[in-house]
C-alpha cells in the first residue's frame, strides 16, 4: 500500500503536530458556487430551459450566488435547496417544444375556429434558437429535428410567423440527412413513429420535406415495423405504455380509449392528451392540459406531472452527494409523500399514472426502506417475467439505469426475500455484462459518467460502501444541471440535476477533508510520541484505521467518535501483533487490570512496566476525559484482552469493543446496553464481523481489485448475517432504539465488510482519493 503518495503527486505530510484529542471542533466553512449559462432562446432571463422562472429560482437551479464569504454562501445554498424542496409540486421540468406544438395544434373546442391554447403558439414564437431550430441547449440532432418540424407545423397551421417557419425549414433541410450519422443510443422515445407522423402532417400543409432519401426511408420502415407490432386490441383494452405516444396514430377508437385516461391524461403525456382532445373535445383532457399550459407560460413538458420522479431522485442525489444531513426535514416530507402513494404494484413517475414501472418502484423502495418505512416487496413480482425484470409491460429492451436502480434496491433485502435475491442476481449479471462489453449507455439519460456510477455500484456494493467514499466518487460522476434526460424530447429536471447541490456538496466535502487532514496529522504525532512503530505498527496501518473511521463518521462534529474508533483499531492491531507467550499475555492483562483499577481509583498515579500497557491506559484516559466513562472503557478493554489471552474469536471481540467504545464516546447511556434490541444487534454484528475477519484471510480478487463474489461457506453465512442486520437496523418499531444507535451497528459491520471485500490496492487508492485528493 503506497500510502505516502497518490496519483496527483501529493505526499502525505509526515510532520508532527498536536496530540489527538477525542473532541475537536471546527466551524463549517464552505465556498462559492459557479455561474450558469443560458441558451439564446432564454436570453434576458425569460426562462430557464423553457420555464418562466423568477431570479431566485433561476439562481437556485444553477448554483450561482454572489457573496464571497464561504460561510454565508453555504447557508444561502442550503436555504435555496430548502426552498426548492418546499416548492416541489407536480415537478419542475423543462418545456418540450414538440409537445407544446401538439398542444398548439388543438382548435378551440368552443367552435371559434381559433387555437384553444394561443399562449402555446406564443411560447413557440419566443423560443426559436438562433440557428432556426427548437430544442434543448444540448445539441442532439434527433431532438432538434423533431422539435423544429413540430413547431413549423404548428405555426404553419395557424398561418403565423412565416419567417420563423422558413428559418426552421432551412435548419431541417440542411440537417435531416445527417440523422444517419447520429448515435442510435440517443434516439428519442418513439422517434421512428413521431417523425413520419409530422412529415405526413407537413405535407398536408404544403410543406415540402424530402422523404425519398435512404435515411428517411429507413425511419419510415422502422415506423411501419413498429406499428405492425402494436396490438391494437390491447391498446384499447387496458393501460399500456402505448398510451404515451398516441399522437399521429390513425384508426383509434376514442370512445374506448377515453376510459383509459387517468386524471384527464394519457400516461401524463401532454402531446398524447392534446391529440385526444383534438379528436374528442373531452373536458377532462382539457382540464389536464390547462395545468401545465398555465404553469409553464404556454409551454408544456414532455411528461407532466413528474412528482414521484422528482421527489425520489432529488433525495437520492442529496444522499449520494453526502449533504442529506442538512435536509432531514425536507427528505422526510418527500418520503412521506412517496409512501402516501405507494401500492403493492409499485409506483410510477407520477402519483396517478395507471401503469407502474420498476425504475421508480426500485428507487422508492430503496429510499423508503433505508428510512424505516414498512414497505412490501410484492411490487417487484409484477416486473419479473421468465427470470428477467422488466421496467414495464410491453418493454422491448432493458435500460441500464433502470436495471442499476433495481440492483441498488435489491441489496436492501431481508432474509428470505427471494424475489429481491432474484432481482439482485439478474441485475448484477446484466450490469457486469454491459461493463465487460463497454456498453454502459442509457436510453433514458445523458449523464456525466454513467459507466463510473455503475462501476462503483458493482465494485463497492451497499454492504461495503463507506459514506465518504460514495460521496467522493459521486462528486465526480454527478453532472449537475448538465445532465439531460431522454424522453419524447430531451428534458431537464431542475430539482434533480442542480448545480446548487453539486456546489454545496463540493464545499462541504472540502471542509470535512480539511478537518480530516488536521486530525490525520495529530494521529501521526500521537503515533510518533507513543513510539508505536517500535511495536511493529506501520504508518500504513495507522492511516487505514483513521481512513475507515473518517469515511464513516465523517461529519466535522463527530471527531469524538472518529478518534476513539481509529485509536481502538490501532491499539487492537498493535497488541494482537505482539509475539507473546501465554504467560506474557497473562502478565500483560494483569498489568492492565491493575493499572486501570489504580488509575480509576486515584487519578492516574500508577506507572506500568509495559510501555504498551501505558499507551493503552493513557489512550483510554484521553477518550474518557470529561465524560466519566473511564471505568466502562476499561471494562470493555478487559473483555477484549481476555479473549485475546484465551485465543478466542478476535473479530467478534474487536467488534464488541469497538461498538461499546463508540457508544460510550457518543454519550449513549450504559443502561441501553441491556436493551433486548441492543443485545440482538450486538450478537448479529459481532458474528458477522468475525466471519468477515475469517474471510479476509482467504479472499480471492478479480481484475477490478475487489472480490467478485463472496464464495466460501463462511461468507454465505456473512451474507445472511448482513441481511439480518439490515432487517434489525432500518425498520422503525414502537419499542425501538434511536436510528443513530442502530445505524452505528451497521456502520461497524460495513467497515469490516469493506476491508474484507476490497483489495489492498483498491483501498490504497480510496484512501488517497478520500483524504488527500483535492476536489476540483
Curated annotation (Swiss-Prot):
Reactions accelerated catalytically: ent-8alpha-hydroxylabd-13-en-15-yl diphosphate = (2E,6E,10E)-geranylgeranyl diphosphate + H2O
GO MF, one example: terpene synthase activity
Main location as per UniProt: plastid
Biological process, per Gene Ontology: gibberellin biosynthetic process
Cofactor requirements of the protein: Mg(2+)
EC numbers on record: 4.2.1.173
InterPro entries to which the protein is assigned, alphabetical: Isoprenoid_synthase_dom_sf, Terpene_synth_N, Terpene_synth_N_sf, Terpene_synthase-like, Terpenoid_cyclase/PrenylTrfase
Subcellular location field: Plastid, Chloroplast
Keyword Transit peptide: yes
Transit peptide, residues from-to: 1-60
Pfam families documented for this protein: Terpene_synth
Any GO CC annotation of this UniProt entry: chloroplast
Residue window of motif DXDD motif: 357-360
Keyword annotations from UniProtKB, A to Z: Chloroplast, Lyase, Magnesium, Metal-binding, Plastid, Transit peptide
Pathways involved: Secondary metabolite biosynthesis; terpenoid biosynthesis
Binding, Mg(2+): 357, 359
Domain topic, free-text comment: The Asp-Xaa-Asp-Asp (DXDD) motif is important for the catalytic activity, presumably through binding to Mg(2+).
Family listed: Belongs to the terpene synthase family.
Role played: Involved in diterpenoid biosynthesis. Catalyzes the conversion of all-trans-geranylgeranyl diphosphate to ent-8alpha-hydroxylabd-13-en-15-yl diphosphate.
PANTHER family, per the entry: ENT-COPALYL DIPHOSPHATE SYNTHASE, CHLOROPLASTIC
UniProt-recorded name of the protein: Ent-8-alpha-hydroxylabd-13-en-15-yl diphosphate synthase CPS4, chloroplastic
Phylogenetic lineage: Eukaryota, Viridiplantae, Streptophyta, Embryophyta, Tracheophyta
Amino acid at each position: 500500500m503506497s500510502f505516502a503518495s497518490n496519483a496527483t503527486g501529493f505526499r502525505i505530510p509526515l510532520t508532527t503536530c498536536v496530540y489527538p484529542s477525542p473532541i475537536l471542533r471546527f466551524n463549517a466553512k464552505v465556498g462559492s458556487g459557479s455561474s450558469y449559462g443560458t441558451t439564446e432562446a432564454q436570453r434576458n432571463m425569460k426562462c430557464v430551459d423553457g420555464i418562466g422562472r423568477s431570479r431566485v429560482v433561476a439562481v437556485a437551479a444553477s448554483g450561482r450566488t454572489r457573496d464571497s464569504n464561504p460561510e454565508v454562501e453555504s447557508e444561502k445554498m442550503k436555504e435555496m435547496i430548502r426552498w426548492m424542496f418546499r416548492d416541489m409540486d407536480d415537478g419542475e421540468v423543462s418545456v418540450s417544444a414538440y409537445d407544446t406544438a401538439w398542444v398548439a395544434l388543438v382548435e378551440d373546442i368552443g367552435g371559434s375556429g381559433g387555437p384553444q391554447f394561443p399562449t402555446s403558439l406564443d411560447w413557440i414564437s419566443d423560443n426559436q434558437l438562433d440557428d432556426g431550430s427548437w430544442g434543448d441547449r444540448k445539441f442532439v440532432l434527433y431532438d432538434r429535428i423533431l422539435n423544429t418540424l413540430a413547431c413549423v407545423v404548428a405555426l404553419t397551421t395557424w398561418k403565423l410567423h412565416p419567417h420563423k417557419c422558413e428559418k426552421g425549414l432551412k435548419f431541417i433541410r440542411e440537417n435531416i440527412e445527417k440523422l444517419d450519422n447520429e448515435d442510435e443510443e440517443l434516439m428519442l422515445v418513439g422517434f421512428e413513429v413521431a417523425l413520419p407522423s409530422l412529415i405526413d402532417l407537413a405535407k398536408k400543409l404544403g410543406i415540402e420535406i424530402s422523404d425519398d432519401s435512404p435515411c428517411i426511408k429507413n425511419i419510415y420502415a422502422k415506423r411501419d415495423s413498429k406499428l405492425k407490432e402494436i396490438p391494437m386490441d390491447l391498446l384499447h383494452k387496458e393501460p399500456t405504455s402505448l398510451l404515451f405516444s398516441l399522437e399521429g396514430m390513425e384508426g383509434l377508437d376514442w370512445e374506448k380509449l377515453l376510459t383509459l385516461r387517468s386524471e384527464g391524461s394519457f400516461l401524463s403525456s401532454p402531446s398524447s392528451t392534446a391529440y385526444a382532445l383534438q379528436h374528442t373535445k373531452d373536458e377532462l383532457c382539457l382540464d389536464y392540459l390547462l395545468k401545465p399550459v398555465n404553469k409553464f407560460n404556454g409551454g408544456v413538458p414532455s411528461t407532466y406531472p413528474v412528482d414521484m420522479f422528482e421527489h425520489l431522485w432529488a433525495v437520492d442525489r442529496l444522499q449520494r452527494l453526502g449533504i442529506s444531513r442538512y435536509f432531514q426535514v425536507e427528505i422526510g416530507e418527500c418520503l412521506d409523500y412517496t409512501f402516501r402513494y405507494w401500492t403493492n404494484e409499485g409506483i410510477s413517475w407520477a402519483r396517478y399514472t395507471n401503469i407502474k414501472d420498476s425504475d421508480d418502484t426500485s428507487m422508492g423502495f430503496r429510499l423508503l426502506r433505508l428510512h424505516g418505512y414498512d414497505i412490501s416487496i410484492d411490487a417487484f413480482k409484477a416486473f419479473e417475467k421468465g427470470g428477467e425484470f422488466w421496467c414495464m409491460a410491453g418493454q422491448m429492451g432493458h435500460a441500464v439505469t433502470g436495471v442499476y436502480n433495481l440492483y441498488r434496491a435489491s441489496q436492501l433485502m431481508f432474509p428470505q426475500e427471494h424475489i429481491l435475491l432474484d432481482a439482485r442476481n439478474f441485475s448484477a449479471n446484466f450490469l457486469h455484462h454491459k461493463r465487460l462489453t463497454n456498453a454502459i449507455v442509457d436510453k433514458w439519460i445523458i449523464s456525466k459518467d454513467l459507466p463510473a456510477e455503475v462501476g462503483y455500484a458493482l465494485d463497492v456494493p451497499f454492504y461495503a460502501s463507506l459514506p465518504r467514499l460514495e460521496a467522493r466518487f459521486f462528486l465526480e460522476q454527478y453532472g449537475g444541471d448538465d445532465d439531460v434526460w431522454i424522453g419524447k424530447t430531451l428534458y431537464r429536471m431542475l430539482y434533480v440535476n442542480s448545480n446548487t447541490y453539486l456546489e454545496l456538496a463540493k464545499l462541504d466535502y472540502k471542509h470535512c477533508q480539511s478537518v480530516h487532514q488536521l486530525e490525520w496529522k495529530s494521529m501521526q504525532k500521537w503515533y510518533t510520541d507513543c513510539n508505536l512503530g517500535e511495536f511493529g505498527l506501520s504508518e500504513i496501518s495507522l492511516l487505514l484505521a483513521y481512513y475507515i473511521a473518517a469515511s464513516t463518521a465523517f461529519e466535522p462534529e463527530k471527531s469524538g467518535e472518529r478518534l476513539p474508533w481509529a485509536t481502538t483499531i490501532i491499539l487492537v492491531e498493535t497488541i494482537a501483533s505482539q509475539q507473546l507467550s501465554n504467560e506474557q499475555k497473562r502478565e500483560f492483562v494483569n498489568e492492565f487490570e491493575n493499572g486501570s483499577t489504580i488509575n480509576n481509583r486515584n487519578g492516574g498515579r500508577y506507572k506500568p512496566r509495559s510501555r504498551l500497557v501505558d499507551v493503552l491506559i493513557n489512550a483510554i484516559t484521553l477518550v474518557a476525559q470529561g465524560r466519566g466513562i473511564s471505568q466502562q472503557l476499561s471494562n470493555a478493554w478487559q473483555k477484549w484482552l481476555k479473549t485475546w489471552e484465551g485465543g478466542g474469536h478476535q473479530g467478534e471481540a474487536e467488534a464488541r469493543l469497538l461498538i461499546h467504545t463508540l457508544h460510550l464516546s457518543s454519550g449513549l447511556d450504559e443502561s441501553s446496553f441491556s436493551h433486548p434490541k441492543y443485545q440482538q444487534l450486538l450478537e448479529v454484528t459481532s458474528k458477522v464481523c468475525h466471519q468477515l475477519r475469517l474471510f479476509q484471510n482467504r479472499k480471492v480478487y478479480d481484475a477490478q481489485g475487489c472480490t467478485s463474489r463472496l464464495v466460501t461457506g463462511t461468507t454465505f453465512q456473512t451474507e445472511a448475517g448482513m441481511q439480518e442486520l439490515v432487517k434489525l437496523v432500518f425498520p422503525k418499531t414502537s419499542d425501538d432504539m434511536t436510528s443513530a444507535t442502530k445505524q452505528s451497528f451497521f456502520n461497524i459491520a460495513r467497515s469490516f465488510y469493506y476491508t474484507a471485500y476490497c483489495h489492498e490496492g483498491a483501498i490504497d487508492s480510496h484512501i488517497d482519493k478520500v483524504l488527500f485528493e483535492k476536489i476540483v
